[in-house]
Curated annotation (Swiss-Prot):
Naturally occurring in which organism (per UniProt): Mesoplasma florum (strain ATCC 33453 / NBRC 100688 / NCTC 11704 / L1)
Molecular function terms from GO: small ribosomal subunit rRNA binding; structural constituent of ribosome
Residue span of region Disordered: 1-20
NCBIfam families: S20
Biased composition (Basic residues): 1-11
Keywords recorded for this protein, A-Z: Ribonucleoprotein, Ribosomal protein, RNA-binding, rRNA-binding
Lineage: Bacteria, Bacillati, Mycoplasmatota, Mollicutes, Entomoplasmatales
Domain of life: Bacteria
Protein's recorded name: Small ribosomal subunit protein bS20
Gene Ontology terms describing biological process: translation
Amino acid sequence: MPNIKSQKKRVLTNEKSRASNKAIKSEIRTAIKKALAAKKDEATDATDLINHAVSLVDKGVKKGILKPNKAAREKSRLMQA
């Protein structure tokens, strides 16, 4: 446990950001799974789900939650046959 006041504050802010990042990552993973499942079943709304997943991945990179290479890999996998 930190003794310095600023470090105690950092512990609290880190917990908040960790929870936020975890929620966003979970949302991204769920969107990717739904898009891949729809694509596999050849559903009519597959393109909408893929576009939504790609949008979330891009937002994750913009916020610094995902690394750019991982985002590119995920987007590539979504777009492939």
